[in-house]
Amino acid sequence: MTAKKTIDIVEKALEESKKLDRKFKENVDLVFNLKNIDMNLPKNRIDQEVILPHGRGKEAKVAIFASGELAIKSKKHVDLLIKPEEIEELSSNKKKFKKIADEHEFFIAEAPLMPTIGKSLGTVLGPRGKMPKPVPPNADVSGMVNNLRKTVKVRSKSTITFHTIAGSADMPKEQIAENIDTIVKRIEGILERGRLNIGSVYVKTTMGPSQRLI
């Protein structure tokens, strides 16, 4: 059950957002500040993917590297299909591929193509945290893509302050609040000391002021 406090904080953030006439659809962001933890140690860094129960508001874009039957089967479910013969072309046109990498949140790939992708395009995908997930044999590509469209990445790198998306400002406050509670619970669960490693958590719209949750 979603905490009433979370719903109240989301409501405040949305009310503040409405005071300002935005010309675009704002996201609702969740900002974490950790404490008593050494982020120079790789084991302490956050690198999680969380499926939001009510989605992101605006779905994440997904691209697939595939050939043959998988390419045919998956084309209608993804935003971009990259065939094996295109990998070499993209590796020699990094500017073009960087644009693709920035426009797509997730990449999946036919398993046999993974080594080629890593060798040819890994320098672009790796630093962005977007190396493809292999598609298992006989996988339900539609289900896999649908889950990714509702997924957010939570990455701290080496800093104690980091943020992620919890939804969009036009979603019902109860849905945003449940998304937030799902993310916070995940982060608490992987921190060595749980809630004791969290200094504060703020909720805000893209351009709006922060409202403290924790």
Regions found by a protein language model. Give the residues of each.
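Translation machinery proteins
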Residues: 18-72, 89, 93-94
